[in-house]
């Protein structure tokens, strides 16, 4: 099965839970016999690196700014999918998952999975407009994804 991963900065993981999670998942999928492709950002993964532990890396340029980094890279990855023979597309994080509609439009019939790692809109680094966009993106992704995975549980308040 050909599985494409969108939304992470890249692998190998240098820091961050999303990248570590993706690296663990994709290398296990390769060991299970699947053909795996990870879209990477050149400001995170060296674009000369084409393969890592059996995983195919696809480096795409993006607008490397606080507000446009993830969404511009995700947009490019969705467009790139039109050239690919994907069996499954797996998005990671709320921001990138807001473009699931585009992947569904460009690759009809291909199952889309999304993994939410955290409620990004609760992070203090985002302003009101960015938080609104992330909340809308979360809602859209939950409605359009074929499967939704949540790997975090909110901490209990005692």
What function would you assign to each model-found segment?
Residues 2, 35-37, 111, 146-147:
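Residues at the starts of beta-strands that form the adenosine-phosphate
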Residues 91, 150-151:
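Short beta-strand scaffold positions
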């Amino acid at each position: 099965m050909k599985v494409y991963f969108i939304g992470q900065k890249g692998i190998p993981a240098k820091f961050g839970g999303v990248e570590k999670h993706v690296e663990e998942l994709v290398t296990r999928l390769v060991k299970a016999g699947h053909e795996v492709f990870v879209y990477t950002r050149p400001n995170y993964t060296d674009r000369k690196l084409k393969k890592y532990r059996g995983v195919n890396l696809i480096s795409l340029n993006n607008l490397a700014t606080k507000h446009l980094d993830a969404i511009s890279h995700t947009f490019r990855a969705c467009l790139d999918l039109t050239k690919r023979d994907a069996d499954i597309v797996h998005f990671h994080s709320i921001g990138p998952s807001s473009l699931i509609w585009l992947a569904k439009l460009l690759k009809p019939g291909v199952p889309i999975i999304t993994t939410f790692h955290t409620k990004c809109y609760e992070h203090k680094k985002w302003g009101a407009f960015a938080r609104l966009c992330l909340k809308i993106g979360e809602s859209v992704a939950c409605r359009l994804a074929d499967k939704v995975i949540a790997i975090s549980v909110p901490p209990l308040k005692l």
